[in-house]
A protein has these predicted regions:
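Phosphate-handling active-site elements
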Residues: 143-147
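Intrinsically disordered, low-complexity segments enriched in polar/charged small residues
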Residues: 7-9, 22, 174
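Gly-rich Lys/Arg/Thr-decorated short loops/hinges at beta-loop-alpha junctions or inter-strand turns
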Residues: 7-16, 56-58
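A short glycine-threonine-serine/GTX helix/turn-capping micro-motif
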Residues: 12-24, 167
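Cofactor-centric catalytic regions
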Residues: 1-3, 27, 37-39, 43-119, ...
């Protein structure tokens, strides 16, 4: 992997996916493929045999519990991969959130401006990672309303706390906050129409406060 750093006078921007991790992963997976070729191993099988599973421990000491779907994912693509002449395969597991015992909070505000216009105020900077799309999908999934009437707006003046735009936190932190606010709207929609709810504001909030602090002596790092 070769890289070049350039010092410029441009205004710095936030990170957009990975801080270089994607490039390193590409190189590591390529090395795994080369080792398989040299040793006569099956590229799919070596990844399956070494995949993390519930009860396993990561390199940082976290004992995994649920939601580990690497093997199921590999099983789902096995036939397609092995039948394709030109196909690559790679595996990865992604955490979300800052961790280290730091409470991580997200807040949103949903405003019913009219029956044809609903605003979702949130503080997450959209740089192509799909935060706006995710917020609309969560909102519509909960309420059953059309995405055509929903607009997502980033506005820190609206006190929509989000923290840093880092660590792939958008889907979990903002997503849960949208669910919280949208659930309240859904309850009102069972009794009232959007026209009757025009002008109403719904606050949503979600906090991840269960991660392990750096100085903690724990057998299971979260």
């Amino acid at each position: 992997v070769r890289s070049r750093a350039v010092y410029t006078n441009n205004i710095p921007c936030g990170a957009m996916r990975g801080f270089g991790v994607n490039q390193i992963n590409f190189a590591v997976e390529s090395c795994v493929d080369e080792l398989c070729e040299m040793g006569g191993f099956d590229r799919w099988q070596i990844r399956y045999d070494n995949a993390l599973t519930p009860g396993g421990m990561t390199s940082t000491g976290q004992v995994l519990q649920s939601g580990i779907g690497i093997r199921k994912t590999l099983e789902a693509v096995k036939d397609v991969f092995q039948q394709s002449r030109h196909a690559g395969i790679a595996c990865g597991i992604k955490n979300t959130g800052i961790g280290n015992g730091v409470p991580d909070t997200g807040k949103v505000k949903i405003v019913i401006e009219s029956p044809e216009r609903i605003l979702i105020h949130q503080g997450w900077t959209e740089m192509g990672q799909g935060v706006y799309t995710m917020a609309v999908q969560f909102f519509c999934e909960v309420t059953g309303l059309s995405p055509e009437i929903v607009e997502v707006r980033v506005d820190t003046a609206e006190e929509s706390e989000s923290g840093m735009t880092t660590a792939s936190r958008g889907t979990s932190i903002i997503g849960h906050s949208v669910i919280d606010a949208a659930t309240k709207l859904k309850q009102d929609l069972e009794q009232s129409s959007l026209e009757e709810l025009t002008g109403k504001v719904y606050q949503g909030e979600w906090t991840c406060d269960w991660t392990t602090a750096l100085e903690s002596d724990s057998d299971n790092i979260q």
